[in-house]
Amino acid sequence: MRKDMEVTGLVLAGGRGTRMGSVDKGLQLFNGKPMGQHVLERLRPQVLHLLINANQNLETYSAWGTAVWPDAIAGFAGPLAGLHTGLLHCNTPLLVTVPCDSPFLPLDLVAKLMAALQAQDADLAVAVTGQGSTRQPQPVFTLARVDVLPHLTAFLSGGGRKVDAWYATLKVAEVNFEDEAAFRNINTLAELQEFSHTAPAP
């Protein structure tokens, strides 16, 4: 792989899990093992290195054998704070982010995002599902150049927290994925039960 195409994968597990009763979503069992481990297993073949962003239970996550970093910005500042942390600790030119509650994520996620990023010479590539009225950006499934770190730092320092507001200031390549189910987030305990016997796409 060319050096300028090397990718680090970041699993975002730094949220409060409020819709799941304020539990750590990445550690909730799904088909016999923590959701975060399912995510790591599907992301690992697609990247050179792996990182986890978490703000609680750091020792538990570290036991999985992957480097774990809490937000550099205090106060559970959202997914941009996780991206910021990942960029700070990324040793490759590119960083891909995925949430810890997405055990069905596509096995071609990085390849498709990479192709669009390179073709459009974009700052970021973001997954999109659906068409027309059902079109839905998936902003936490993103591939970013590490060069955007100073820009993101300035945005966060100015109080910015909304992902779409920051993306609007950058050149973003949107990449359509046909399999909407692959981007399913498990946000509640009911969904955890409902989808616990669903097999991910190969």
What are these regions (language model features)?
Residues R2-G160, A165-A182, L189-E194, P200:
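Nucleotide and nucleotide-moiety/phosphate-recognizing core
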